[in-house]
Regions:
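Interfacial aromatic "cap" segments that immediately flank transmembrane helices
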Residues: 1-30, 78-101, 133-182, 281-282
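A general structural detector for well-ordered alpha-helical segments in enzyme core domains, enriched
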Residues: 73-77
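Hydrophobic alpha-helical transmembrane segments in multi-pass membrane proteins
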Residues: 21-56, 91-112, 119-132, 170-197, ...
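Generic structural hydrophobic/aromatic packing signal, biased to beta-strands
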Residues: 116-117, 251
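Juxtamembrane transition segments at transmembrane-helix termini in multipass membrane proteins
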Residues: 8, 55-72, 131-149, 159, ...
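Helix-boundary and loop/linker segments of multi-pass membrane transporters
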Residues: 10-14, 37-40, 78-81, 114, ...
Length: 282
């Protein structure tokens, strides 16, 4: 079922061009943030990036809606984007805040125990993985079922823990997509910045180890390397974000969406006429 959902998601990229919208917006946001950083610095680029990130759930909601609702017009996309914006935004904000709170709490505890900063940060970042794993379907659940944020989070946990093999296969395919995107990003970045990276590649191991942390950061923050990285990231985002979002919606629709069965006519209050047509009593 996970593989069928993936193949369906890929086919939707051709059948429904609107599912490309999250990737197109993400690519635009990445390049726009880069130009704002280049022209005005991080003090301007950071709030703009946060603002664009807050807008992004509208594109998620629109894509979820046209896939789950089996629609394809731009009017339907806008309708679902407006309807599901806060339903997608709030659960994701709760997850981010919860991850921030738990990771910082764990970092302080590990530092008090006596572990180094690097080890403490490693364990704190690793803590985010279970949150993503269990709450992955919270936003689409909140939108489709019109659940409040915390009920959507709970429902996502229930779906994940009771999904057995299909959920496991779904996450494995997502991990494979992540590694594919990482490989393509690294290859594109290296290809675009080959001239700037050539001096670094010719350095010996001893020369690299002799560099301070600030010197290493300065090397990789060179304009050509930085612009190549942002361009490669934008290209990968425009390709893989639509695949991942469509895959999530297709899998949810095929495996996790519980449609209520319509009540049978015999169980309703009404009667049949002489021609066998059913009339429900009001």
């Amino acid at each position: 079922m996970a593989l069928k959902s993936l193949s369906e998601a890929v086919s939707l990229l051709l059948k429904k061009p609107l599912v490309w919208m999250p990737g197109m917006f993400a690519a635009f946001a990445i390049l726009f943030i880069y130009y704002m950083y280049t022209l005005f610095g991080s003090s301007v680029a950071l709030p703009i990036g946060i603002g664009l990130l807050v807008i992004f759930p509208a594109f998620l909601a629109g894509t979820y809606g046209v896939i789950v609702g089996d629609k394809s017009s731009s009017a339907d996309f806008r309708k679902y984007a407006a309807y599901g914006y806060f339903r997608c935004l709030i659960p994701n904000l709760v997850i981010i805040m919860l991850g921030f709170l738990l990771s910082n709490t764990l970092t302080y505890i590990l530092l008090m125990v006596g572990l180094s900063v690097d080890v403490a940060l490693y364990f704190s970042i690793f803590l985010v993985i279970p949150l993503v794993f269990f709450f992955y379907f919270a936003d689409i659940t909140a939108m489709v079922n019109n659940f409040p944020a915390f009920r959507a989070l709970k429902d996502s946990v229930v779906k994940v823990t009771t999904g057995s093999f299909h959920i496991t296969a779904f996450y494995l395919f997502n991990i494979a997509l992540f590694f594919a995107a990482s490989f393509i990003f690294s290859a594109m970045w290296s290809l675009l910045a080959v001239d700037a990276l050539l001096p670094i590649s010719q350095m010996t191991q001893g020369e690299i180890l002799a560099l301070s942390q600030n010197e290493l950061i300065a090397l990789f923050m060179a304009p050509e390397i930085l612009s190549s990285g942002f361009l490669a990231l934008a290209v990968c985002a425009s390709i893989f974000i639509p695949i991942v979002v469509s895959y999530k919606a297709c899998f949810f629709k095929r495996n996790l969406l519980k449609l209520e069965a319509e009540p049978k006519a015999e169980e309703q209050q009404g009667s049949f006429d002489a021609d066998g047509r059913w009339y429900k009593y009001s």
